Amino acid sequence: MRKLALDLGTKSCGFAISDLLGIIASGLDNFIYEENDFTAVLAKIDEIMINYHHEIDTIVLGYPTNVYDGSKNERTYLIESFYALLKQHFLNHEKIKIVYEDERFSTKIATQRLKNSCVKAAKIKKVKDKMSAVVILESYLSKNHFN
C-alpha cells in the first residue's frame, strides 16, 4: 500500500506519495489554497485517494517543532488542529492510519537538494513544499519500511 505525506502550511501544502512497496517517495503536488482553508486540503486529499484507487493506507503529516529543543510552536498547534480534522474526515475509514513525522530541517534539506541539482531560485520557491513532503515521507519510510 502507498503512503501519502503532507507538508502543511497556512497557504500551501506539499504532497508526496510512495510506491506500492513503500520504498520510494515521489513529489506529487504543491497545492496552493486560501489562507487556512483546510477544507480545500481535505478535498485535495480525497482527490488523490481517488486518483490512486484508494491504495493509500497511511497519511504522514509533517510535525513541526522548535529546531533546537523540540518544543511546540504556533505551527505545531496548527498541525495538531489539522490532524484532528483529518481524523474526523477519515473516521469511517479504519484502514487509513494518520501519523506524525518530525519535519525539522525538511525544508532546508529539500532546498539544498534542489540547489545541488542546479534548480533556479524561482523554481525552488514553487516546488519546495512538495520536495519537503518527499523528505518527510523518506524519513517515515526509512523508519517504518519493515513494520
Swiss-Prot record:
GO terms for molecular function: nuclease activity. Keywords: Cytoplasm, Hydrolase, Nuclease, Ribosome biogenesis. It is found in: Cytoplasm. SUPFAM superfamilies: Ribonuclease H-like. GO terms for cellular component: cytosol. It is an enzyme of class 3 (hydrolase). CDD domains: YqgF. InterPro entries: RNaseH-like_sf, YqgF, YqgF/RNaseH-like_dom, YqgF/RNaseH-like_dom_sf. GO terms for biological process: rRNA 5'-end processing. Its EC number is 3.1.-.-. NCBIfam families: RNAse_H_YqgF. Belongs to the YqgF nuclease family. Could be a nuclease involved in processing of the 5'-end of pre-16S rRNA. This is Putative pre-16S rRNA nuclease. The lineage of its organism: Bacteria, Bacillati, Mycoplasmatota, Mycoplasmoidales, Mycoplasmoidaceae.
